[in-house]
Each structure stands twice: as C-alpha cells, then as structure tokens.
Amino acid sequence: MQEMSGLDLIDLLGERHFGLRRIAEELWNERGDVAISNSEWFVMTRIGSGEPTIAEVSRQVDITRQATHKLIRKMLEKGLVAVSDDERNRKVKRVRLTELGYKCYENNEELKAELEARIAEAIGTDKVAALKAILAMDWGLKNRET
C-alpha cells in the first residue's frame, strides 16, 4: 500500500475507502457468480429492501439520471433489479432488488463484516468502534453533506 503518512484527512479517507472497495470487489468477484461493480454495489445499497424511484436513487448516488438509467439497465440485464411503474404515476419508475439481487446484497454484507473483523484483528476492536463512532458523528458540514 502506498505511503500514507504525508496525506491529509481527506486524502487518507479517500485512499482507505478506495482500497477497501477494491478489496471487497475482488473478494466478491472471486466468490460470487455475478460480477458486480462498485457503482452497482453503491446503487444496490441505496435500494436495499425498499423500492425507491429511479430519480431518488439518482439523487442519493449523486450521478446524472441518464447515468443512473444506464447503470440500472446493466443491473436489469444481470437480473439484480426489477423496474416497475409507480402505482400513482405511470411516468415514475420504481426499482427494487430481485431475489438474486437481494441474495447478492446479503452475501456482500457478510463479506463486509468479514473485512471489518480482519481490520479489527489488525488494529483492535476498540479502535474500529472508535473509528465508526467518529465517522458517524455530525462533522458540522451539513451544507455539503447528503
């Protein structure tokens, strides 16, 4: 891993996030039957067990509606999501995880728990708990956070 001692907070967080996502994606692709990109995982996490509109997903992942539609089309082809008309407004499309999508989502949650356990083994459970608490705090940046 690249030398990180000279990095500021923003870059440290970014490097760790990128590294963990890469490891998680590699582990999933070694174990899973369906190749799923980080972008697809990000969308699947936003969908979860709900049925948001495609516009809501687009706002949550902070990408254009066009890019969201393209990503969801790829996920449809893989059988990870299903799209349906909203009951009240047929112009509005809702997206949900399919049985396969939800199974992948659940298996990925287990994989992330394994990674967290490995991190705790390396740095200690107390430090992992402290890190999670710090990351969950209100950092006073509400005007830019989502």
Protein language model features and the residues they cover:
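Charged, amphipathic alpha-helical coiled-coil/dimerization segments
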Residues: 26, 73-130, 136
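Amphipathic, non-transmembrane alpha-helical scaffold segments
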Residues: 10-17, 61, 109, 120
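N-terminal helix-turn-helix DNA-binding core of bacterial DNA-binding proteins
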Residues: 22-66
